[in-house]
């Protein structure tokens, strides 16, 4: 089950890489009738479910969790929800790459924490260390670090042109 769990944990990252590097292809594939950010969100939710199932397949759940669980999970999820609240679906799911005009956000956590959604996700993963073997948490976290690096090299000329 270890190899399948590792594959499941890594499953979304090739998809995200492909979208980031082939934004116009994704916009064309979605066509005029479907919003590329919404379609990306739906696919991402399915892939996230596969990731979580992969973690559960190797987890040893126990109660109560260690004390470090609560602040890491709470602040990590706060960051995730706050990013979504400020950016919305289009801002969270590569809307800028897909040719949408997304306003620049400077409210917390932006301007204070670099890549707050990824930081929040990594914090949430670290909260689960008492239940999930370290190598799976590390693998998933390295996927986020890879995406942070990839997205830091954004070239405005590589953005998709809207087909609407």
Swiss-Prot record:
Instruction: Report, per the Swiss-Prot or TrEMBL entry, which residue stretches are intramembrane.
Output: 1-21
List the Cytoplasmic topological domains.
53-69, 152-164
Lipid biosynthesis: is it a keyword of this entry?
yes
Task: Give the record's membrane topology.
Answer: Multi-pass membrane protein
Q: Which GO terms describe its molecular function?
A: phosphatidyl-N-methylethanolamine N-methyltransferase activity; phosphatidylethanolamine N-methyltransferase activity
Which BP terms in the Gene Ontology apply to this protein?
methylation; phosphatidylcholine biosynthetic process; phospholipid biosynthetic process
Transmembrane feature ranges: 31-52, 70-90, 132-151
Pull the Lumenal topological domain ranges from the record: 22-30, 91-131
Q: Which domain of life is it from?
A: Eukaryota
Q: Briefly explain the null phenotype.
A: No visible phenotype under normal growth conditions.
Annotated pathway, please?
Phospholipid metabolism; phosphatidylcholine biosynthesis
The family database entries (InterPro entries) matched by this protein are listed as: PEMT/MFAP (IPR024960), Phopholipid_MeTrfase (IPR007318)
**Catalytic activity entry:** a 1,2-diacyl-sn-glycero-3-phospho-N-methylethanolamine + S-adenosyl-L-methionine = a 1,2-diacyl-sn-glycero-3-phospho-N,N-dimethylethanolamine + S-adenosyl-L-homocysteine + H(+); a 1,2-diacyl-sn-glycero-3-phospho-N,N-dimethylethanolamine + S-adenosyl-L-methionine = a 1,2-diacyl-sn-glycero-3-phosphocholine + S-adenosyl-L-homocysteine + H(+)
* Binding-site residues, S-adenosyl-L-methionine: 74-76, 154-155
| Entry GO CC | endoplasmic reticulum membrane; intracellular membrane-bounded organelle
Coarsely, its chief localization is: endoplasmic reticulum
The EC class name is transferase
Report keywords, A-Z. Endoplasmic reticulum, Lipid biosynthesis, Lipid metabolism, Membrane, Methyltransferase, Phospholipid biosynthesis, Phospholipid metabolism, S-adenosyl-L-methionine, Transferase, Transmembrane, Transmembrane helix
Give the location in the cell.
Answer: Endoplasmic reticulum membrane
Does the record's keyword annotation contain Methyltransferase? yes
EC number(s) reported in the record: 2.1.1.71
Q: Which family does it belong to?
A: Belongs to the class VI-like SAM-binding methyltransferase superfamily. PEMT/PEM2 methyltransferase family.
What is known about what this protein does?
A: Catalyzes the second two steps of the methylation pathway of phosphatidylcholine biosynthesis, the SAM-dependent methylation of phosphatidylmonomethylethanolamine (PMME) to phosphatidyldimethylethanolamine (PDME) and of PDME to phosphatidylcholine (PC).
Protein name, as recorded: Phosphatidyl-N-methylethanolamine N-methyltransferase
Gene name, please? PLMT
């Amino acid at each position: 089950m270890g190899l399948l769990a590792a594959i499941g944990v890594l499953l979304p990252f090739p998809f995200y890489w492909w979208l980031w590097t082939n934004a116009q292809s994704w916009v064309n594939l979605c066509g005029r009738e479907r919003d590329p950010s919404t379609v990306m969100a739906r696919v991402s939710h399915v892939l996230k479910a596969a990731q979580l199932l992969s973690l559960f397949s190797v987890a040893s759940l126990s109660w109560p969790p260690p004390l470090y669980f609560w602040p890491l999970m709470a602040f990590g999820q706060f960051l995730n929800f706050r990013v979504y609240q400020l950016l919305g679906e289009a801002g969270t799911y590569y809307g800028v790459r897909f040719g949408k005009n997304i306003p620049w956000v400077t409210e917390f956590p932006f301007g204070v924490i670099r890549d707050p959604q990824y930081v929040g996700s990594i914090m949430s993963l670290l909260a689960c260390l008492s239940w999930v073997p370290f190598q799976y948490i590390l693998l998933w976290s390295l996927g986020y670090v890879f995406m942070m690096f990839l997205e830091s090299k954004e070239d405005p000329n590589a953005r998709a042109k809207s087909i609407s």
